[in-house]
């Protein structure tokens, strides 16, 4: 989340009116005003990239800068409800020991894009015996300190690939995504916690006996 100020009253008024509008609001990306509108890195990048959310824009951006707890004042839906409304999610992790967001996505049968700098991405690769692809339900992209542009291109290509798929292909990918999520249930992972606690307790006992 960013340094959120308050919900946009001009946006709220339009939503409540139920009317159709053909003129954009000021700063037509963001749902809530920020305390630092002129210094927010996301907004700065959108402006730098020439994003406008105009009628002719092929890409429309909706920047929700707050926690999705169901009480944000504009959408008033939870994060999980929002995930369900997606066809594909993108979490291009730079570093996450595990990374729950792509796992949560596939648990809702929504395919995800992540990287091998997330533990989840590495784990999915281990399931597949190599880099997981979009058809598997999770696309894992190689990311390092030096390949930002390559990662951006890979994300772009994957989104374009997904958008060209037939409904039958998407259904299969969604099923594969859910199958991956099933393998991450606690009933499968809990044994590793038992093993870790066992090792820790044995080592603690050795230290006590050596005193």
Which residues does each predicted region cover?
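Catalytic cores of carbohydrate-active enzymes across secretory and cytosolic contexts
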Residues: 1-211
């Amino acid at each position: 989340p960013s340094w959120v100020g308050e919900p946009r009253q001009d946006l709220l008024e339009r939503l409540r009116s139920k009317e159709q509008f053909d003129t954009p609001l000021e700063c037509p990306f963001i749902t809530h005003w920020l305390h630092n509108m002129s210094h927010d890195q996301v907004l700065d990048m959108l402006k730098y990239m020439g994003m406008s959310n105009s009628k002719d824009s092929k890409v429309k951006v909706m920047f929700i800068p707050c926690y999705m707890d169901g009480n944000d004042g504009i959408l008033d839906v939870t994060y999980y409800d929002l995930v369900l409304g997606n066809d594909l999610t993108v979490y291009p992790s730079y570093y996450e020991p595990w990374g729950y967001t792509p796992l949560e996505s596939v648990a809702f049968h929504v395919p995800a894009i992540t990287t091998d700098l997330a533990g989840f991405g590495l784990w999915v690769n281990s399931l597949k015996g190599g880099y997981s692809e979009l058809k598997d339900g999770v696309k894992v992209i190689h990311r390092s300190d030096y390949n930002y542009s390559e990662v951006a291109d890979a994300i772009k290509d994957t989104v374009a690939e997904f958008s060209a798929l037939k409904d039958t292909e998407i259904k299969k990918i969604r099923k594969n995504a859910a199958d991956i999520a099933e393998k991450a249930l606690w009933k499968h992972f809990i044994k590793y916690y038992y093993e870790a606690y066992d090792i820790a307790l044995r080592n603690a006992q050795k230290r006590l006996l050596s005193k």
